[in-house]
């Protein structure tokens, strides 16, 4: 299958899906005009990856801000991971944030409450 490369802009995160490594990373702000257009292709990539065997999938996030529609899209992605995890698939998420940005830490905590798969929240001095 293929990798996913979506360049970041002022209002959208840079998104890389590495099929071989089993890693999806996102970094930057997320307040796109059309979050479905942006995240639809990410959700498709995750669905294809999860349908192809049993290899682990790791999400690595460095998201600074998410608007409401981006939060909804992220919830859809996490639901896919949770379903895969419940089916025995190894999945994990690591959310990095600037320790000065407590809002992002709180958002990550809220997401983690709904997930039973490994979900690390790591503070950094940016």
Swiss-Prot record:
Modified residues (Phosphothreonine): 68
UniProt-listed Pfam families: SiaC
InterPro entries assigned: SiaC
Signal peptide: none
Keywords in alphabetical order: Phosphoprotein
NCBIfam families: phos_prot_SiaC (NF038265)
The protein, known as: Uncharacterized protein PA14_02130
Species of origin: Pseudomonas aeruginosa (strain UCBPP-PA14)
